[in-house]
Amino acid sequence: MNFANITTVAEKGSNLLLKNERGIFWVSVLRYILMRLLYNDKYPEIDKNMSDCQMGARKHKGCRHNIFMINGIIHDVMSSKQKSPVLLQIYDYKQMFDAINLEQALGDISDAGVKDDSLSLIYQANKEIMMAVNTPSGLSDRKRLENVVLQGDTWGSILASVQVDSIGKEVESSGFGYRYKDILPVSLLGLVDDMVGITHAGHEAQQLNALINVKTAEKRLQFGVSKCKSMLVCKNSEDVPNNHLKVDEWKVTHTDNLETGDSVLTETYAGLVNIDKTNEQKYLGFQLSSKGDNMKNINMMKTKSIWIIRKIFSRLNSLHLQKYYFECGIIFLNVMLRSSILYACESYYALKETELRQLERIEENFLRQLFKTSAGCPISQLYLEAGHTPARFAIQRSRLLFLKTILNEKPESKIYQFLQLQFQNPTRGDWGSTCLKDLEYLQIKMSLDEIKAVTVNNFKGMLNKSIEQRALQYLKDKRGSKGIEVNYSKIEMAEYLIPNDEQLTIEGQRYIFSMRNRMVNVPVNFPKNQSEVKCACGVKEDMQHIYLCEYWNKQIETTEYTNIFSDNVKLQVEVYKRFKVNIEIREKYLSENEYKHETNSHAISLIDPLSSVYEYSNGNK
């Protein structure tokens, strides 16, 4: 029961530094089952007694709740010059699980509703731990730890969350916090060991800062000073009081005992130190901006996407997927890329068209690399051929599902009241107003009460059906001349790209894509600044003519060229093979006879007699 092994998980930074390793405790199966049974029994009571200041370790709550409210506050303050400046105080506890005092944590759990002998059992399970570290050379010697909260154990996160929640309750009752739209108090938002204090700039910010310092000291916790920041939110920062906030700092020194060989770790109080001021800060994976600029987070997503795309293609190329290549590529796109760049996308406020396009271009860049096509390929065709819906519709879906989540919260919950205030006192670009526009655009004629009443699965079904119809129409409306010959009834991957019985290589699939979308390197497909181009036979050249031209291939072809635009893979392959042979003969002929375009492009200039073309097509030179 009291045996545990530590497995290290690398964090950001050098792998050579011990401080960049996080230790996760792995406990015995018997202990895990017992603690899980206790947790399942006591969680409802604990959750009921926790405040909305803490979203960590709670069911149906998470990062997006806090990000949504913080972005809402920033958006509201930036909506008018008349709004009072707000100061965000961002705090992070250093190695909180190592610092938690077990007896204090259990006292807070008792206040949260656990008052029977379960408390004694939790205490005995954590009073003394015999731990060892998993290393490349095996387990280390076991050492005894006393009165610890195990990170990775069933009760670890909830014990930490309840401790921070107790600080949040003190802050709420102090009255130092901010009131959203001058009505709803929002003083502190936490997610396990990450906190954001929210006050008006000035003396209230100093009062809140002092209170958090005192309550943190009472819990024997320590701040990670480098991660603590303050952010002033206002239209005009001139003449706004913004003195430095301070937190307690502790310094750690290691002393080696030469006689015993032991290393002693000593912590020394270093006093109050200033925390840095910033205009943008990463909080729970989302880049906050003091001006409410969505591009700060979008640019971070664009940078992040570079290595994700490289990682995806590295996997695709190493797995030798053959006919499963494109299908797996789209799966990786959804699972690895989209899930990363659209993280917390439902919490954006006033997202502009240009900002949406910046997010969509990330995926479009991936699709261009997947098909190995140039920037001239129509964007709509990338989506339609791959069976992929643009990111804007995924954002709408996430936003409306989050709307459903908020509406299903208890009426007294903070996030529910937060949203209701947006409906009652709307400002331009409010999240609530955006949701109503989404419902109208997707032609979902439901009131908020009806959305609240319907089941989640039914609402998802309505959303998916509506998005599929609207996304298809949106992409069709964006089409130009290229790809217009292809008929799409729904958004799904084209038949020639999915596994089939035809012997098609990956390059062959890409070539069919370029044929269907007129991206083959033929002058008529790129007509800008070019005069009309004729084939060597004197007829106006286009892709269909190259396919049928007898001067390139004397064999009579019965398969219509237009079958390349159909869903019949067998006919598509027949057209592709004939066209590929003809285009290669044509290119070789042009190269050997040094044909030049009249406009210095790749158009065919009529210089040699037609007889030479006839002879060339029959193998005579």
List where the protein language model places each region.
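Conserved pre-catalytic core of RNA-dependent polymerases
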Residues: 1-166
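Conserved, non-catalytic sequence blocks in retroelement Pol enzymes and Pol-derived host proteins
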Residues: 26-31, 55-64, 79-80, 94-98, ...
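Short Cys/His-based metal-binding microdomains
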Residues: 526-575
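Catalytic palm active-site di-aspartate
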Residues: 3-6, 22, 70, 86-96, ...
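Short, conserved micro-motifs composed of acidic
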Residues: 137, 224-279
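Long, charge-rich boundary regions
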Residues: 564-619
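Helix/loop segments that flank and initiate small ligand/metal-binding modules
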Residues: 444-540
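Non-catalytic, peripheral interaction segments enriched in hydrophobic/basic residues
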Residues: 191-193, 224-229, 233-235, 240, ...
